[in-house]
Design a protein with these regions (language model features):
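Thiol-/selenol-based redox modules, centered on thioredoxin-like
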Residues: 145-146, 153-190
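Solvent-exposed loop/turn segments at secondary-structure junctions
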Residues: 63-65, 108-112, 141-144, 167, ...
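N-terminal "domain-start" segment that seeds a small globular fold
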Residues: 21-47, 68-71
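Positively charged n-region of N-terminal signal peptides that target proteins for export
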Residues: 1-4
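Bacterial N-terminal signal peptides
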Residues: 7-16
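Short active-site neighborhood of thiol/selenol oxidoreductases, capturing the structured segment around
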Residues: 46-73
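Thioredoxin-like thiol-disulfide oxidoreductase module
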Residues: 111-154
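Structural microenvironment flanking redox-active thiols in thiol-disulfide oxidoreductases
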Residues: 65-128
Length: 190
């Protein structure tokens, strides 16, 4: 009986891990060309405009992904955008300046394109002005499901690109320290 329960638990755990597994098929491939728009309405071409620096892209298709995406905001801000106040830091506060590109990319495709203007305005109104340089909008017919292996619309996806625009790491879902540690390891090694 114990063997059966253990086997069922093992299969269930494998199913859960597989369901939340990032898109490994994208790793090692060039990030597909994507034209986005920055906060000021100017075109930003991914990955062309990011070449020369490592890049972290956070991409979401729907408001259903917003909850998981929000779990990343503070850790990303604290690591890459915010500055440590030296007067309040103690000896254990270690801050490293990362020279990387960072973009949050809400994606408006298919039916969502019809509401993209109002959705963009809503996102802009709720976004801290300090984060405007890190916000891009994709508004297009192409979903990139095949190239980037997006499995769920209610999940945010994260891509680390090398200096040439090749995907070197992917993850998805809620923030956890292990995911951030892998991202930081890549940035620190390069």
């Amino acid at each position: 009986m114990k063997k059966i329960i253990f086997s069922v638990l093992a299969v269930a755990m494998i199913a859960v891990v597989t369901a939340f597994k990032p898109a490994p098929g994208a790793v090692g491939k060039m990030f597909p060309e994507m034209v986005c728009e920055n906060y000021n309405g100017q075109a930003v071409h991914l990955p062309v405009d990011t070449k020369g620096k490592y890049t972290l892209l956070a991409m979401a298709f729907s408001t259903a992904a917003e909850g998981d995406l929000k779990t990343w905001i503070n850790p990303i801000y604290n690591k890459f955008i915010g500055k440590v106040d030296a007067s309040k830091a103690d000896v254990f506060d270690v801050h490293m300046d990362y020279d990387v590109n960072l973009y949050f990319v809400p994606m408006f495709t298919g039916f969502n394109q019809l509401a993209s203007k109002s959705s963009k305005d809503k996102i802009k109104s709720k976004t801290d002005k300090e984060l405007y340089p890190y916000l891009l909008f994709y508004d297009g017919g192409k979903t990139y499901n095949d190239e980037l292996e997006f499995k769920k619309r209610d999940t945010p996806y994260f891509f680390v690109l090398d200096k040439a625009g090749k995907v070197v790491y992917t993850t998805s879902g809620k923030y956890d320290d292990n995911k951030m540690e892998k991202i930081l390891d890549i940035f620190e090694e390069n």
